[in-house]
Amino acid sequence: MILSTERLSLIPVNEFRDVNALTDALWEIHSDTRTYSHRPDLVMKQRSEAIELRDQWTEDWQQKGRGYYAVSYQGEIVGFAGVRHYILAGDAVLNTYYRFRPGAQGKGLAYEAVKAALDASAQLGKECIAIISPDNLPSVTLARRLGFRRSPDRDVSPEDQVYVLQNPQNEATANQL
């Protein structure tokens, strides 16, 4: 299902009609060293990696009915965002992801896109996490703005810290007990 915000269209990758344009955007964003200044080792080196990622994300939508969206702003794919089913230390959770073109950063687009994706996934009732490199300060800042908080006891590695979305409704219930 396509999501719309005031400025954005979020298109599930399996519903994106122009597969070549989708692959091009994946490659351009994920091979841009500016996108991975915090972790240069993660930069895509071959276009085949973008094709593999596209196929994996398409499969997520087809098999699990949830996944990442291509984020369109003014008719251009400016990034990717959403949640997908993920197993973290044996627990089924939703992993939150966002990656945007450098020219699209700093405009509130990632916040708007991720918020829409989280809102659309709220009915699933699963815990949402974000795995973030501590050196990626813009990503940490965005996660905190969205309500995610550090959960050091669940860290994957020193390079991959876990943030958990705090649910005020659950906290209120816990405080009443």
Question: Can you say where each PLM-predicted feature lies in the sequence?
Answer:
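A generic structural signal for short
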Residues: 46, 60, 127-128
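Short secondary-structure capping micro-motifs at structural edges
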Residues: 55-58, 83
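A short helix-loop-beta-strand connector motif used in the catalytic cores of GNAT acetyltransferases and
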Residues: 57-69
